[in-house]
Design a protein with these regions (language model features):
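Short helix-loop-helix connector
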Residues: 45-46, 84, 121-123, 156-159, ...
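Alpha-helical transmembrane segments of multipass membrane proteins
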Residues: 35, 39, 150-154, 176-181, ...
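Short alpha-helical transmembrane segments in multi-pass integral membrane proteins
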Residues: 1-23, 77-141, 181-243, 301-362
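Small-residue-rich hydrophobic transmembrane alpha-helices
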Residues: 53-104, 148-156, 275-329, 333, ...
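Long, acidic/polar, low-complexity amphipathic helices and coiled-coil-like
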Residues: 91-93, 158, 166-173, 180
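Transmembrane helix-bundle signature of multi-pass secondary active exporters and lipid flippases
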Residues: 21-74, 243-303, 328, 359-366
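Residues that define the loop-to-transmembrane-helix transition and helix capping
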Residues: 49, 87, 132, 161-162, ...
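Short runs within selected transmembrane alpha-helices of multi-pass transporters and secretion channels
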Residues: 70-77, 137-156, 164-172, 194-210, ...
């Protein structure tokens, strides 16, 4: 079996690179959707209101609801060793996705939304109704992400990382198609165009992941012999394994609603929230190289003498992305990105550049965080 042969060889940095690259490209394709959304919404009617509605309402709420399913990718990569473990994890994924989707519906379609947005986030009144519409359109978001991350973990474990990149390409193409329709033909409200594009993209990616993973499930997964003991995927063991991972992503993603609530209480709140999606989008483009490392570490550490090569690769990658991000922040490239590509007003663009200074260490730190996190998950 290919998997067994790969594990028998000593790992070199080149091996880590070729394992990481498809995932990194996948994350970059996914990261491109937020700048694309910002660029289109900024060119439709009332861009200040609709960008702020997405950045200050829809995005932080949808992200925090989704947070518990983020680490299904790591769990699937680590635990889906055979048909029995696949079936157990599939049930857990469906329960989590369904429960969190129900929570999303309760927030988006009941007065709970008003309490959270007005009282907790303290959002400017102008963005409340557009944000409500956007949250309702984003209803498929959590379940589809849970499903595709679970399937992508299986793809990574059985040596088909390139399928993750293909899925991200499907997502981006769908996203751009909806954005193009909204901008060139319909010219509707920016919040509707943007959130419809995001929801359609993740749904298309989940469908592709389902189709692409079926041959693996019916083939390699059924006959898998990883050389490792069977994973204990009983409910109690799974919760003991997964709850720390879910709490990690929850704590990390809590930064978004906490940051939104803080910004909404400061001077120039509406302007800051309008610039926020473009700032987050650019930072995410640089951080995704580190976010894609976690599953590579988990998979590589099962091979002999791999720790040194993976660790050295992680340190070099951290230095590289830090230098690349600093180049954008400390030169006119940053201002040019916000004005020419994102179509922000000069005042919003200057806000964005100032914000980037405070995030200079994040891309490199994200790489190192995922190197250590991958080791903990493997252990």
């Amino acid at each position: 079996m290919r998997e067994s042969c790969d594990r028998a060889a000593v790992v070199r940095q080149r091996d880590v690179l070729w394992s990481w690259l498809p995932l990194a490209l996948s994350w970059m394709l996914m990261a491109a959707e937020l700048p694309a959304l910002g660029a289109v919404v900024a060119r439709l009617a009332d861009p200040r209101i609709h960008l702020a509605a997405y950045g200050g309402g829809v995005f932080p709420l949808a992200l925090i609801i989704e947070a518990p399913v983020i680490m299904l990718l790591s769990a699937s990569t680590a635990l889906c060793r055979n048909r029995a473990s696949y079936r157990a994890l599939w049930r857990y994924m469906m329960v989590m996705g369904g429960a969190l989707t129900l929570l999303h519906v309760l927030i988006a379609f009941t007065p709970l939304f008003d309490f959270i947005v007005n009282r907790v986030l303290h959002a400017p009144p102008e963005i409340v109704e557009p944000a409500r519409v956007g949250m309702r359109i984003m209803t498929p978001w959590t379940w589809t992400i849970a499903y595709r991350r679970f399937m992508q973990g299986i793809q990574i474990r059985f040596g088909h990382s390139r399928l993750v990149g293909f899925g991200s390409a499907v997502r981006l193409i769908t996203n751009l198609s909806v954005l193009s329709f909204g901008y060139f033909i319909w010219k509707g409200p920016g919040i509707i165009v943007g959130t419809a594009a995001i929801a359609a993209g993740v749904t298309a990616e989940a469908l592709f992941s389902h189709i692409a993973t079926r041959p693996i499930i019916n083939g390699a997964l059924c006959t898998a012999d990883s050389g490792l003991p069977d994973a204990d995927v009983g409910l109690r063991a799974f919760l003991a394994f997964y709850i720390p991972l879910a709490l990690t992503s929850l704590v990390v993603l809590l930064v978004n609603p906490i940051g939104t609530a803080a910004v909404a209480r400061m001077p120039r709140a509406l302007d800051s929230l309008a610039a926020w999606p473009s700032v987050v989008g650019l930072m995410f483009l640089f951080r995704c190289s580190g976010l894609s490392l976690n599953e590579v570490v988990i998979a590589m550490l099962e091979r002999p003498d791999s720790r040194s090569a993976v660790g050295q690769f992680s340190r070099r990658l951290s230095l590289f992305v830090t230098a690349a991000f600093a180049l954008v922040v400390l030169t006119p490239l940053g201002l040019g990105w916000f004005t020419a590509v994102q179509n922000l007003s000069p005042s919003h663009a200057q806000l964005g550049v100032t914000a980037l200074f405070f995030g200079c260490v994040l891309p490199g730190a994200t790489v190192l965080q995922n190197w250590y996190q991958g080791q903990l998950v493997y252990a």
